[in-house]
Regions:
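Peripheral, non-AAA+ core regions of ATP-driven protein-machinery
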Residues: 2-13, 17-83, 88-96, 101-112, ...
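Conserved Walker A/P-loop ATP-binding site and its immediately adjacent core
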Residues: 126-132
Length: 455
């Protein structure tokens, strides 16, 4: 007897399920995101059931034998860095980013690097035909006989291809285009994305094939589909950057086999993505000399210190309420620091519009750049350039104190490497710096004390 389809209403944003339609999702609060989906209990059981899964008895954790971790290197050092040192066998990696940011380009270049090492790789595209992939590969210079390509969206066909071709690395581009015939909903729906990811996860763990899942993002920048998708995978990478800027940042926000918040920096060119081995030099290459409103600081991305230039412009406001336009920084943090400057430094910023930008389109969110924000605003407000070859570090509290920051040694080492000769750091960090040769490091306790040393 044929089972009738069960109708459920599912939120396309968070995966919340309800027996009837609602205009607003009660779980995530999104309007008009709940759509009708049809499925059967039998089909769901079929999708979740592994092909052959004999029951495994529990074992004591100390009796489990560890094999030597053999990571595959993609020949793209910035990607390997973001992954924590290469590809772990059986890992499931989700990479998301805005349309046109370079996700598919990065995947093709990574597979080309692996194919050149003799690794058998498979690129599954649900968005392009093999001819279109070949055209793009010709432009990128990534044509290789070891790079297998197939255009397919049906999960049964894809798993059959994987079983017959036995690739050592797999890319699915994209997970939102995959389709399970057992489910009546359209490709890209929450249930389709969830079930496709489950089947690929079971395959990856069983066969040991490292698998990349390329994911679309929503207009708020989150990966489209259920949040369960990010919980299910081993690594989540976000490809960030403005399409109007040439730099791209690959950021690891989750990594079971490496450091989180690790980044890789790339530059988009006509022939694809180029690695940026020394981001500090690139971000500071066009910095104007002796310009008011410019401050340099060392931001820590994962374990990697990068020197960035913060730019500020304070100008008299033409409106009753001054404007605060911030790019690349936390606007709330800048507003907080502006209030501290009014109270502690006596600068009447309420009559000034404040515009701030991080040069190169980088995003900086850590509190360790607070003193650089204060310095850039003060420099523009007073129309005085900061002393040459000076870098400013430190977190600022509401009472104007400058607090110690982490990884001070690696930050100061990067400052020295880039040729800066003077560094203002929190007084609490002075004793932790082991090597002071070739650079003058000055401890500061308050923002008012720092203001006297900046110019």
């Amino acid at each position: 007897m044929k089972k009738s389809a069960k109708i459920i209403y599912c939120c396309q944003r968070c995966g919340y399920q309800a027996p009837k339609w609602m205009g607003k999702c009660p779980d995530c609060g999104t309007w008009d995101s709940i759509v009708e989906e049809r499925t059967t209990a039998a089909s769901l059981r079929d999708v979740h059931r592994p092909q052959s899964s004999p029951q495994a008895p529990p074992v004591a954790i100390d009796s489990i034998e560890l094999e030597k971790e053999n990571r595959l290197l993609t020949d793209i050092q910035e990607l390997d860095r973001a992954l924590g040192g290469g590809l772990v066998p059986g890992t499931l990696i989700l990479i998301g980013g805005d349309p046109g940011i370079g996700k598919s380009t990065l995947m093709l270049q990574a597979l080309f690097g692996l194919a050149n090492q003799g690794v058998r790789v498979l690129y599954v595209s649900g968005e392009e035909s093999p001819q279109q992939i070949r055209l793009r590969s010709e432009r990128l210079g990534t044509v290789s006989p070891g790079l297998l390509v197939v255009s397919e969206v049906d999960m049964d066909s894809i798993l059959a291809t994987i079983q017959s071709e036995t690739p050592q690395v797999l890319v699915i581009d994209s997970i939102q285009t995959m389709y399970n015939a057992e489910l009546a909903s359209a490709p890209g729906s929450v249930s389709q994305v969830r079930e496709s990811a489950v089947r690929l996860m079971l395959m990856a763990k069983k066969t040991g094939i490292p698998t990349f899942l390329v994911g679309h993002v929503t207009k708020d920048g989150a990966i489209a589909g259920p949040k369960l998708l990010e919980h299910m995978v081993d690594t989540v990478l976000y490809f960030e950057g403005d399409r109007n800027h040439m730099f791209r940042i690959l950021r690891a926000v989750k990594n079971r086999f490496g450091s989180t918040n690790e980044i890789g920096v790339f530059e988009m060119k006509d022939q694809g993505l180029d690695e940026v081995a020394n981001p500090s030099a690139v971000f500071l290459s066009e910095r104007p000399a002796n310009a008011p409103g410019s401050a340099v600081t060392a931001s820590l991305e994962g374990t990697r210190p990068i020197l960035v230039e913060l730019q500020a412009l304070a100008s008299s406001t033409s409106f009753g309420t001054p404007r605060r336009t911030i790019l690349g920084l936390d606007p709330n943090r800048v507003a907080l620091l502006a209030a501290v400057m009014e109270k502690q430094l006596g600068m009447h910023l309420m009559g000034y519009d404040i515009f701030m930008n991080v040069a190169g389109g980088v995003k900086v969110v850590e509190p360790a750049v607070d003193m650089a924000i204060v310095s850039a605003i003060a420099s523009s407000f007073l129309d005085k350039p900061i002393a040459p070859a000076t870098v400013v570090l430190g977190e600022v509290g509401l009472t104007g104190e400058v607090r110690a920051i982490g990884q001070i040694d690696s930050r100061v080492a990067e400052v020295k490497k880039m040729g800066f000769t003077r560094c203002l750091v929190p007084d609490g960090n002075i004793k932790r710096i082991r090597n002071l040769d070739g650079i003058k490091v000055t401890g500061i306790k308050t923002v008012s004390e720092a203001a006297e040393m900046l110019f």
